Amino acid sequence: MKKEKADKAQEKETDQRKQAIDAALGQIEKQFGKGSIMRLGADTRMAEMNVVSTGSLDLDIALGIGGFPSGRIVEIYGPESSGKTTLTLSAIAETQKKGGIAAFIDAEHALDPSYAKKLGVNVDDLLVAQPDNGEEALEICESLVRSNAIDLIVIDSVAALVPKAEIEGDMGDSHMGLQARLMSQALRKLTGTISKSNTTVIFINQIRMKIGVMFGSPETTTGGNALKFYASIRLDIRRIETLKEKEEPVGNRVRVKVVKNKCAPPFRQAEFDIMYANGINRESSLIDLAVRHDLVAKAGSWYSYGGEKIGQGKEQVKNFFLENPDIAFKIENQVRDLNSLPLMDQSKIQTREVKSIERDPKETKETKSKQPVSFSTEAEVDIAVGE
């Protein structure tokens, strides 16, 4: 009897609390508009996180969610010529492939349209702005975000967002903390709008050295501390090796460390090749991932798949994947499945034509097998040599 009374009292209290919450929600929506407050499970926009691929499968895996998240701020920083702009242009190309609209705010006034085209960017559809000062750049960014029509915005770079007062002043004038205050104010205004518009905003940043640091890293990024707090993802990209072909540099191998990640576990790393001719090399990343997940076996310099040898040296295997896109597609989907990433659509397989190289007729078959194989891309022909 006592238990029944206690249950009824508890049920009555629960109903009263529910009515009070509903009344409060109704009042908030009446005052601030519909959607100003809601239950998390009922908000599909917050429950499902859309992502934009980085163009590197290894980095997509390291990020834990398959790419850059929509409605968030991302910071990419690193030394000069480490691949920061290339990585963002690759993300723009992936956005355009999905039918999205991208914008590039070129504060450094250094965007090369021909290079962007080589990376797969549709330059005819890419929105580009070259602002005169930092305030103008950030106002352009805010206008694009508020349009709710842009999927990805890249700002290159934070260091080039020079405040108007500094531009109008004389050389040698002191403007202590002016850029940091500009970034802090802009990010306070932008963060909420970016989230509501579901736009991904990527800030490229540069590295500076702090003077007098005795312990720890003396490196820091420009623009103050605000961006470090507001960014959901921070990537540190470094060049670790120069790729050469017949003693000629043809690309860089880079390592990207996920310094901060609000969407998945941080501190993961990814390594991939960036070729000077066509950007991130997907085949090279696929080989590394396939070997790591035991989908492709490696014995010495030989690689084998399904019990059959597919090439000696990485370059031969890259050519094998280019000549057999179906096998590359199958392996990539296996890697994606093992890492809980969405699978690729078979209709989006891109084949690349493999051109033959003129040989000396006196060459034997054995000699031919040791010769470099060339393969073409949309932009130009790269020569691939065996390891």
UniProtKB/Swiss-Prot annotation:
**SUPFAM superfamilies reported in the protein's UniProt record:** P-loop containing nucleoside triphosphate hydrolases, RecA protein, C-terminal domain
> Which parts of the sequence are annotated with region: Disordered?
350-387
Q: Tell me which UniProt keywords the record has, alphabetically.
A: ATP-binding, Cytoplasm, DNA damage, DNA recombination, DNA repair, DNA-binding, Nucleotide-binding, SOS response
User: What are the binding positions for ATP in this chain?
Assistant: 78-85
- What Pfam families does UniProt report for this protein, alphabetically? RecA (PF00154), RecA_C (PF21096)
Superkingdom is Bacteria
Identification of the protein by name: Protein RecA
- Which PROSITE patterns is this protein grouped with? RECA_1 (PS00321), RECA_2 (PS50162), RECA_3 (PS50163)
Q: Where is the composition biased (Basic and acidic residues)?
A: 350-369
Major location, coarse class?
cytoplasm
Q: Which family is it part of? A: Belongs to the RecA family.
| InterPro entries per the UniProt record, alphabetical | AAA+_ATPase, DNA_recomb/repair_RecA, DNA_recomb/repair_RecA_CS, P-loop_NTPase, RecA-like_C, RecA-like_N, RecA_ATP-bd, RecA_C_sf
> What function is annotated for this protein?
Can catalyze the hydrolysis of ATP in the presence of single-stranded DNA, the ATP-dependent uptake of single-stranded DNA by duplex DNA, and the ATP-dependent hybridization of homologous single-stranded DNAs. It interacts with LexA causing its activation and leading to its autocatalytic cleavage.
* GO biological process terms held by the UniProt record: DNA recombination; DNA repair; SOS response
Q: Which CDD domains match?
A: RecA (cd00983)
Q: Which GO terms describe its molecular function?
A: ATP binding; ATP hydrolysis activity; ATP-dependent DNA damage sensor activity; damaged DNA binding; single-stranded DNA binding
**Where in or outside the cell?**
Cytoplasm
What are the annotated GO cellular component locations? cytosol
